[in-house]
């Protein structure tokens, strides 16, 4: 959890926002996935948000669903994902690493065992996409027991009671959703969300990072200008992977260029 605090303090001193890319572990193969993560970090990613392949990712649009299918086709298992996470942490001791999960994957070997494994491989946070705050007690208790930040989604229509609960129970960062629906760069984020950012700050919530539909530098600039601590981009990044499956070197160079541009937009 401390890695997020250190990151946000450092960026605040530099008057920068955070840029956080999302990719699915093992897409399109374990070997290429690790090269992709190296590239994201080299291009300026401030933290990582990583998905573990799941057969029914309800919160995700077709782009990220296809990433899950590619990882499955490559034979990626949850066990392999934890091996990859351990390798990433060993190579990058300071970068915050977050997981975006679904409850069935957390339940499969027991909630406590899951968070213990996360702690062992150096994961900082876990967002369980299909568990709302009101149903999260067992998850967040296990997370905190193992020093893992429980992350909660703040929807654009959140009422005051929900904002207070998110502020009370969330750690690390708050996932501020730009719009209703599933992930996807083809549906643009609804910007800005100044009123929600102001309320979250008033209630001392973990710093808000805005995601869903963030696909160009202008949106990152608007997000940071609204007072959010930064932006998360997934589908736009996964689309670059999808477009270049047969050209792995082109894939990496396009990812580097995209992430560099998005990170630069956090500085304006």
UniProtKB/Swiss-Prot annotation:
InterPro entries per record: Aldolase_TIM, RibuloseP-bd_barrel, Trp_synthase_alpha_AS, Trp_synthase_suA
Any Pfam family: Trp_syntA
Residues at the catalytic site: 49 (proton acceptor), 60 (proton acceptor)
Keyword Oxidoreductase annotated: no
Parts of the chain that traverse the membrane: none
Entry keyword Amino-acid biosynthesis: yes
Enzyme Commission no: 4.2.1.20
Disulfides per UniProt: none
Pathway(s) it belongs to: Amino-acid biosynthesis; L-tryptophan biosynthesis; L-tryptophan from chorismate: step 5/5
HAMAP family: Trp_synth_alpha
Record-stated family: Belongs to the TrpA family.
Entry protein name: Tryptophan synthase alpha chain
Species for this entry: Pectobacterium atrosepticum (strain SCRI 1043 / ATCC BAA-672)
């Amino acid at each position: 959890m401390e890695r997020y605090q250190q990151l946000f303090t450092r960026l605040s001193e530099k008057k920068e926002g955070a840029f956080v890319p999302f990719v699915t572990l093992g897409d399109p193969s374990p070997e290429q996935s690790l090269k992709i993560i190296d590239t994201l970090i080299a291009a300026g990613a401030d933290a990582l948000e990583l998905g573990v392949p799941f057969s029914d990712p309800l919160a995700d649009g077709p782009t990220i669903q296809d990433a899950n299918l590619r990882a499955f086709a490559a034979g990626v298992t949850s066990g392999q994902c934890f091996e990859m996470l351990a390798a990433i942490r060993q190579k990058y001791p300071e970068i915050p690493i977050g997981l975006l999960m679904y409850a069935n994957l957390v339940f499969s070997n027991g909630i406590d065992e899951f968070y213990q494994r996360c702690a062992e491989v150096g994961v900082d946070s876990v967002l369980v996409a299909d568990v709302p705050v009101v149903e999260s007690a067992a998850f967040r208790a296990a997370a905190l027991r193992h020093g893992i930040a429980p992350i909660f989604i703040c929807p654009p229509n959140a009422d005051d009671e929900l904002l207070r609960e998110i502020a009370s129970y969330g750690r690390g960062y708050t996932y501020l959703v730009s719009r209703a629906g599933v992930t996807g760069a083809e549906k643009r984020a609804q910007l800005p969300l100044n009123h929600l950012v102001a309320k979250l700050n008033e209630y001392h919530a973990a710093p808000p990072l805005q995601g869903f539909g963030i696909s160009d530098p202008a949106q990152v600039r608007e997000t940071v200008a609204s007072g959010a601590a930064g932006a998360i981009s997934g589908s736009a990044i996964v689309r670059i992977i999808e477009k270049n499956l047969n050209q792995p070197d082109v894939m990496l160079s396009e990812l580097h260029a995209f992430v560099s541009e998005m990170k630069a937009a956090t500085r304006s």
